[in-house]
């Protein structure tokens, strides 16, 4: 690559950081870091109606949590918010007006809506038809004077070359081409309030900030020909474009929607539930890209080293919440206890469970956790009433050898001193029950687990019995024997 690599993530501060936008930021970050380039953040806040208070801070805070850093942003550079660049946009609007490449349009929203309705009723493709079409210069002057006298504030429209062909070699999709006559006619580059439209402002910003590559979602493909028109009108060289495929719900096969309640789609959700940021980074990094091979767990440094824009997928990326949770569990299992305990602490504290055994409980359930908030549900056994058994569990407990096993273990636990009551000493007692009764395997361990914990599966049995405590374990076994 000959020119310096400069890429950007340019969010609108209209709400929380969505997984799709996080992927856009991440892939731009990886592209820049892999090629030794510059990654910048620009805030596109020209849509004042959708502006959310604190939206910018939320975006940056969540990116930082993910482990994404940047070289330039509104925090360190002036005029990196579009709302601070209105004078810059005006300069280029005026230039295009002076060169006859743009013009003021006085058609009202009501007139546009009526024309669109007429076109749809006639089976025509909706498009703007130049309001000055067929007017002489005198008629045009009179029309403008009449509109201005009526207090109508004009927009500014780019004069589209309808015979033009607008094409680019997309980094992801390959050759893409649009005809100038198929984009809906002359389009607005400056709104009535003086703010630029997205497709105009983004070109000015990208050019002046020397952006070399624009990598974004393929919902922007239809914007690209309009942006190429602005580059052409201003005589500027366009950057390279790459449009990543949509993210779809793996269960429905449809575009990821906020209505998909079975998925966590905002980075804030993962923070709130106590996921490890490294796991979320890893998962997002594989949504529409992979380095080849079977490996799925990569560090940030490995992602940077391996990232290759030529391996961005042409097929939609499937968002699978179960896969995310599996990956998160892998990270939690392999993390040190202190890290996970600190992650779980707020949830234990809120539930009133930050006892002297809290760290040991986290250690016990760490292999089962996908997020730190799960520690509360996992430890219900130690703080709540004994759960109601399922039909399958009741069937196990109806076995003819169950009373023999439970009575034998109860005697062993009663005989243990407080000093002896440690995980390392509890397992030999279970083995002694096996030796004395001749009962082994599932017929031995399953009744004990269900009697003690009320569940068929869980962490290591000796640790569960130890953390439950000798008296409570005996009480649970006793209650189970009475219910048989």
Swiss-Prot record:
Main location per the UniProt record: cytoplasm
Residues spanning the membrane: none
Motif 'KMSKS' region: chain residues: 255-259
Binding site for ATP: 258
Renumbered ranges of motif 'HIGH' region: 11-21
Localization: Cytoplasm
Protein's UniProt keywords contain Protein biosynthesis: yes
GO biological process: glutamyl-tRNA aminoacylation
A Pfam family this chain is assigned to: Anticodon_2
GO cellular component, one term: cytosol
Catalyzed chemical reaction(s): tRNA(Glu) + L-glutamate + ATP = L-glutamyl-tRNA(Glu) + AMP + diphosphate
Disulfide bond positions: none
Keywords: Aminoacyl-tRNA synthetase, ATP-binding, Cytoplasm, Ligase, Nucleotide-binding, Protein biosynthesis
GO molecular function, one term: tRNA binding
Enzyme Commission number(s) of this protein: 6.1.1.17
Family affiliation: Belongs to the class-I aminoacyl-tRNA synthetase family. Glutamate--tRNA ligase type 1 subfamily.
Function as written in the Swiss-Prot or TrEMBL entry: Catalyzes the attachment of glutamate to tRNA(Glu) in a two-step reaction: glutamate is first activated by ATP to form Glu-AMP and then transferred to the acceptor end of tRNA(Glu).
Subunit structure: Monomer.
Protein name in UniProt: Glutamate--tRNA ligase
Gene that this sequence comes from: gltX
């Amino acid at each position: 690559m000959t020119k310096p690599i400069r890429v950007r993530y340019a969010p609108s501060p209209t709400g929380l950081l969505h997984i799709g936008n996080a992927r856009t930021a991440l892939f731009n970050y990886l592209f820049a870091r892999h090629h030794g380039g510059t990654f910048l953040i620009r805030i596109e806040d020209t849509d004042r109606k959708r502006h959310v208070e604190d939206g910018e801070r939320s975006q940056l805070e969540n990116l930082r949590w993910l482990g994404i850093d940047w070289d330039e942003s509104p925090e360190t550079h002036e005029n990196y918010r579009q709302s601070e660049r209105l004078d810059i946009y005006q300069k280029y609007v005026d230039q295009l007006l002076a060169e006859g490449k743009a013009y003021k349009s006085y058609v009202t929203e009501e007139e546009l809506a009526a024309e669109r309705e007429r076109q749809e009723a006639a089976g025509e493709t909706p498009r703007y038809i130049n309001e000055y079409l067929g007017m002489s210069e005198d008629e045009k002057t009179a029309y403008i004077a009449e509109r201005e006298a009526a207090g109508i504030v004009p927009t500014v429209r780019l004069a589209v070359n309808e015979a033009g062909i607008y094409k680019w070699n997309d980094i992801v999709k390959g050759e893409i081409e649009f005809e100038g006559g198929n984009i809906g006619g002359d389009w607005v580059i400056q709104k009535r309030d003086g703010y630029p439209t997205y497709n105009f402002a983004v070109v000015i910003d990208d050019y002046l900030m020397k952006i070399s590559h624009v990598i974004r979602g393929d919902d922007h493909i239809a914007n690209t020909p309009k942006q190429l028109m602005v580059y052409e009108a201003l005589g500027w060289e366009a950057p390279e474009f790459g449009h990543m495929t949509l993210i779809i719900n793996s269960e429905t096969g449809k575009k990821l929607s906020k209505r998909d309640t079975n998925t966590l789609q905002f980075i804030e959700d993962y923070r709130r539930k106590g996921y490890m940021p490294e796991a979320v980074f890893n998962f997002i990094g594989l949504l529409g890209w992979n380095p080849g091979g079977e490996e799925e767990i990569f560090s940030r440094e490995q992602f940077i080293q391996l990232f290759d824009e030529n391996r961005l997928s042409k097929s939609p990326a499937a968002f699978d919440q179960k896969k995310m949770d599996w990956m998160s569990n892998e990270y939690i299992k392999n993390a040190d206890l202190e890290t996970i305990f600190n992650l779980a602490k707020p949830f234990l504290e809120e539930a009133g469970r930050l006892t002297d055994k809290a760290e040991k409980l986290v250690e016990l359930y760490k292999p089962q956790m996908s997020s730190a908030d799960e520690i509360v549900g996992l430890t219900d056994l130690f703080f709540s009433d004994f759960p109601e058994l399922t039909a399958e569990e009741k069937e196990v407990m109806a076995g003819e050898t169950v009373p023999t096993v439970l009575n034998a273990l109860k005697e062993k636990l009663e005989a243990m001193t407080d000093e002896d009551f440690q995980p390392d000493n509890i397992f030999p007692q279970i083995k002694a029950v096996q030796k004395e009764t001749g009962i082994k395997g599932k017929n031995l361990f399953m009744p004990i687990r269900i009697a003690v914990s009320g569940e068929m599966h869980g962490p290591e049995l000796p640790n569960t019995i130890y953390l439950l405590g000798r008296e409570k374990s005996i009480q649970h076994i006793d209650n189970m024997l009475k219910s048989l």
